[in-house]
């Protein structure tokens, strides 16, 4: 998830440096930097890498992680592109300003109100405003209903929009340029974001019905992600690590299932990706309806719950309930088996609710994956890797999988962990042991970094 610590114009801040230094304290084998935008466009307090001016701050971040991890932690940056999404509008504002009037609107209104026959556009809009809501919804197209009820969202199939039609021509160079900047900043590699609600995830999806050679068939849907990879590889060279994160299952109606993911995995391995990291769900397609004035959030619907499962993910009484623990490992296992059967040794990264040494070790021993990744558990306790290495597992602060952190992300607030907050009331004691007061969130109520820990 995005921690919301960058500046509003996408630069590394002291809070960003502190955030990643704290993760580096635990000396994990690798850290993947948050989703970082490849375009030089306003995107709020999200890190960006779409211009050379972002490189100095990112270089400082790399140096900070190297220092705090004593050089033991490799550092990758996740590169992402995303299409436009708008907040859910007020009904009156949508009808008076945003709705593009069509002949069908006038024809349907004419059957309801004779005044529509000779009404000008402004008068027609006022007639729409006064309609009962169910009647209005029946008059609008499915896409117009979504724009009204959820907010406007671009799709890769909106090829009537020139900038969407041109994505295959534009994206390879944008990703390649961003990857080169990452190399210049000192990162060990990049993770191309092909998962969840990203642009390239939408190209891989079965919902991608583009008819220009970049949709419909598996080959067509994988074409642009592969072209992006080849452009990146050509730009950064063979020694720079280039992997991707993609979905083992979209978990939406009409979306791509594991069979597609296995086929994509083989093609990605054949192309030369250095690793494949597997996730699930997290789509806008089934997101919950946002409040007026807020944007849809891709982790609020069934696919989002599969992406970031909580302890409540399984209904009561389910005999084979897995809960959030290792929930995506079967997907990683299936993809790994397909890649191996095709003769490739590309490492597969398993993730999703891995919070104990036993589960991580079993996933590796059983052949579910070759590498283990853990986000929420590492947020709860950035030192857990070091504690396990030192035989101090009983001191690990275990994630409760309540998604307290995810709820903050949804509200665009600085992400923290509920397990940290109980220490905030004793800053004096912490200052005596660590030499500094805990950094606090902008509202002053939450610590910004995990409590310090020392093996001594």
Description of each model-found segment:
Residues 1-456:
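Flavin-dependent oxidoreductase catalytic cores
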